[in-house]
Regions:
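Formylglycine-dependent sulfatase
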Residues: 2-480, 490-525
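Short hydrophobic beta-strand that contains or immediately precedes a catalytic carboxylate
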Residues: 483-484
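Residues forming the ATP-binding cleft of Hanks-type serine/threonine protein kinase domains
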Residues: 487
């Protein structure tokens, strides 16, 4: 596959990389594949119709699945925005890449797949949400949101220069990506573009043109919405409950002009500031939609179950409107790729930095190793290698993305990357030596939502989770385990740990967890 070698120095070590001319198995030169990686923030697999039709139709995202492969057992290594992105870039678990929680600063001097692609002749770019504190490295072009970014009139940092752009973040991010593809890149080089949307991150603010969508839809309340968390100590301590922790003003847009609606979460002022940053035209559209909802809400004086389910419906309506905008913009990108002749020579990936709760267990947000958070969508279109409309059930994780992109470019995976290239799965078969277990580790505690630190392992059917932590001003010490049979208990309600009937399974998973900790030199658990 290699035609010549580029000898480059990275730090003190020389590494050998192939130039960007590849050969097929017959020795005929083939044009290197471009890479387009589209990642949203907190896009649940439940709200992509290629996975689930209960909530919304996403025809443009589905197009990628229909013309490629849908991974049904795709997971993350740490279900939190910054750490997940660090895992993506490095192919390493959080304790190895140094970005364990959102208080950290990503060490941009470490090796990443964009750097290796860049050194091999690719032109690299990242547009949209970065959320790693330090400036991007390994990119010829970067234009990123500051921190979490804002939905309306956000500030971007364009290769070091701060600029505010009027408009809606999802549209702007797409505009910037298409502008780079069309006008700012060297079209003689293969490219790798990371297109990172802020959406649908909290606070789920829809585009003004989408505000009235789904108004008459009543979303089914999850069967676990009123979960009591029996046998699950950490789950009972969290602060991400729609009923208790979702703010009426910040999250649900009840910023009334009379200033009569007040909340106790400390987020009310932030919610009003989100409205105040809008232009007069944006405010007018916003008021036209939300003022009648606010008026009716104040008149109803809801309490108890009625208030809980009103909050759920309001949350779901706004989340789906934001997803509608994402899907529309994915369509814009696909249309451009097709019209510009790039579609067939570009591998297109759609994913999220982690999963998200759509009311399951009464929650919003992510963080836990439970399925809705741990699992993430992954869809790949690669016409030359992947059968259209296919499905892959192998266990995959976001630490696999970096090795995959290197493999596609003909670059040997560095030894430090613990992820595995997904390319062997593209043919439709799972290799016999493919992994049987995944390792997960969450560190961000004490912090917003108060989810305890934990690690664990999952195989194709069972999951073992270990929660740990010393006593602090917020909670008592915790040292407990949870075991789930995902086949008989997909909602993870029945903790089977120390159940004699599952002793052999518990022993097997514990041995695998211990091995991961030793092999990967895990520093806390």
């Amino acid at each position: 596959m290699k035609t010549n070698q580029l000898f480059l120095l990275t730090g003190l070590a020389a590494v050998t990389l192939p130039a960007c001319v590849q050969k097929d198995k017959k020795g005929v030169s083939e044009k290197p594949m471009n890479i387009l990686y589209i990642m949203c923030d907190d896009h649940s697999y439940q709200t992509i119709s290629a996975y689930d039709h209960r909530f919304i139709e996403t025809p443009n995202i589905d197009r990628i699945a229909n013309e490629g492969v849908r991974f049904t057992n795709s997971f993350v290594a740490n279900s939190l925005s910054g750490p997940s992105r660090a895992c993506l870039l490095t192919g390493k678990h959080s304790h190895k890449n140094g970005f364990t929680d959102n208080t950290k600063r990503f060490d941009g001097s470490q090796q990443t797949f964009p750097k290796l692609l860049q050194q091999a002749g690719y032109q690299t770019a990242v547009v949209g949400k970065w959320h790693l504190t330090s400036d991007p490295t390994g990119f010829d072009y970067w234009n990123i949101l500051i921190g979490q970014g804002d939905y309306y009139n956000p500030y971007f940092i364009d290769n070091g220069e701060k600029k505010q752009i009027e408009g809606y973040a999802t549209n702007i991010t797409t505009d910037l990506a298409l502008d780079w593809l069309d006008n700012k890149r060297d079209k003689n080089k293969p490219f790798c573009l990371l297109l990172h949307h802020k959406a649908p991150h909290r606070t789920w603010m829809p585009d003004t043109c989408d505000l009235d969508l789904y108004e008459d839809v009543v979303y089914p309340v999850p069967e676990t919405f009123y979960d009591k968390y029996e046998g699950r100590i950490a789950a009972s301590e969290q602060e991400m409950n729609i009923i208790k922790d979702m703010d009426l003003v910040y999250d649900l847009k009840m910023a009334d002009k009379e200033n009569e609606i007040h909340t106790t979460t400390g987020l009310e002022e932030n919610g009003r500031n989100l409205y105040n940053r809008m232009t007069p035209a944006q405010k007018a559209a916003w008021d036209k939609h939300y003022d009648p909802i606010i008026k009716k809400f104040k008149e109803q004086k809801l309490t108890g179950k009625a208030l809980a389910e009103w909050k759920y419906q309001q949350y779901m309506h706004d989340y789906m409107r934001v997803i509608h905008s994402v899907d529309r913009n994915v369509g814009r990108v696909l249309d451009y790729m097709e019209k510009s002749g790039l579609l067939e020579n570009t591998i297109i990936v759609y994913t999220s930095d982690q999963g998200f709760y759509m009311g399951e267990h009464g929650w919003f947000d992510k963080r836990f190793m439970y399925e809705e958070s741990f699992r993430t969508p992954l869809i790949i279109r690669y016409p030359a290698k992947i059968k259209t409309g296919s499905e892959c059930t192998a266990l995959v994780q976001n630490i696999d993305y970096a090795p995959t992109y290197l493999d596609i470019a003909g670059i040997e995976k560095p030894d430090y990357m613990v992820g595995t290239s997904l390319v062997p799965l593209f043919g439709g078969e799972t290799p016999r030596d493919w992994r049987e277990y995944l390792y997960y580790h969450y560190y961000d505690y004490p912090a917003i939502h108060m989810v305890r630190r934990h690690d664990g392992v999952r195989d194709s059917r069972y999951k073992l989770i270990h929660f740990y932590g010393e006593k602090n001003e917020h909670n008592d010490a915790i040292n407990c385990n949870e075991l789930y049979d995902l086949q008989s208990d997909p909602n993870e309600l029945n903790n089977l740990y120390d159940n004699p009937e599952y002793a052999d399974i518990q022993t097997r998973l514990q041995a695998r967890l211990d091995k991961f900790r030793v092999d990967q030199k895990v520093d806390e658990y």
